[in-house]
């Protein structure tokens, strides 16, 4: 495998499938199956999951909520997703721990870096919930932060599209997909694949990012193996 320790970023929207809201059990089962295959090959895997399928802080803020309050509600949504994903993984035979940046000891461990790394070394998947515990930071930034903290070799951003495009491929059929970008390309052109804070964190810590389509069968395994898939973002051109 190309990467020994991986941080997988899953959007909350990915978990809802075509439902428009909530969690699609079939999607959770499919993700669990792919993750089980990766872990069985010896890869150490941590996951950061978003909460946009349940609540998105920015939308709440736009609707009149105080931004910090809306972000905290969004963090709680990520914990709901994390626990659901943990259940799916354990039904697939993958030992899993959820660590929350907001204390809720009845359902999750507190986030402790050394403990998370020990879980990974023992072959357990660690799911990080509640973002980084602070408002005004996205779960993409959390993914970059946790990747740096656990010494991950790559951030795999699993999305609904098969990479980064020069414009929205849903709206523009002539959109062109990039196979490779530098961090500076993403920042300078405001490509929007991740927020600038997340990109800067990965850039500063020399952690490559691979953006790929979550829904292609076996794509998580392919991304972990370093196969050419989606768009790769690195320091060098």
From Swiss-Prot:
Catalytic reactions of this protein: UMP + ATP = UDP + ADP
Enzyme class label: transferase
Pathway linked to the protein: Pyrimidine metabolism; CTP biosynthesis via de novo pathway; UDP from UMP (UMPK route): step 1/1
GO molecular function list: ATP binding; UMP kinase activity
Binding site for UMP: 51, 71, 132-139
Subcellular locations according to the entry: Cytoplasm
Superkingdom to which the source organism belongs: Bacteria
Enzyme Commission code(s) on record: 2.7.4.22
BP GO annotations: 'de novo' CTP biosynthetic process; UDP biosynthetic process
Keywords assigned: Allosteric enzyme, ATP-binding, Cytoplasm, Kinase, Nucleotide-binding, Pyrimidine biosynthesis, Transferase
Residues the entry annotates as binding ATP: 9-12, 52, 56, 159, 165, 168
GO cellular component: cytoplasm
Activity regulation description: Allosterically activated by GTP. Inhibited by UTP.
Residue ranges of the region described as Involved in allosteric activation by GTP: 17-22
Similarity annotation: Belongs to the UMP kinase family.
Subunit structure: Homohexamer.
Reported function: Catalyzes the reversible phosphorylation of UMP to UDP.
Annotated protein name in UniProt: Uridylate kinase
Organism for this UniProt entry: Synechococcus sp. (strain RCC307)
């Amino acid at each position: 495998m190309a990467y020994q320790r991986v941080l997988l970023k899953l959007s909350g929207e990915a978990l809802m499938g075509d439902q428009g809201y909530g969690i699609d059990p079939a999607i959770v089962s499919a993700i669990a199956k792919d993750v089980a295959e990766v872990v069985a090959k010896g890869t150490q895997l941590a996951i950061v999951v978003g909460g946009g399928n349940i609540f998105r802080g920015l939308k709440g803020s736009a609707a009149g909520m105080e931004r910090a309050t809306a972000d905290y509600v969004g963090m709680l949504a990520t914990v709901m997703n994390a626990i659901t994903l943990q259940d799916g993984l354990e039904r697939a035979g993958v030992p899993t721990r959820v660590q929350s940046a907001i204390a809720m000891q009845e359902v999750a461990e507190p986030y402790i870096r050394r403990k998370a790394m020990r879980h990974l070394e023992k072959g357990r998947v660690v799911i990080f919930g509640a973002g980084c515990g602070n408002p005004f930071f996205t779960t993409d930034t959390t993914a970059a932060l946790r990747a740096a903290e656990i010494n991950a070799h790559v951030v795999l951003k699993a999305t609904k599209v098969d990479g980064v495009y020069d414009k929205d491929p849903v709206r523009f059929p002539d959109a062109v997909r990039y196979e490779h970008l530098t961090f500076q390309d993403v920042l300078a052109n405001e490509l929007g694949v991740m927020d600038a804070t997340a990109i800067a964190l990965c850039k500063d810590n020399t952690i490559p990012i691979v953006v790929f389509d979550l829904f292609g069968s076996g794509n998580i395994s392919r991304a972990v193996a370093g196969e050419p898939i989606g768009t790769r973002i690195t320091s060098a051109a």
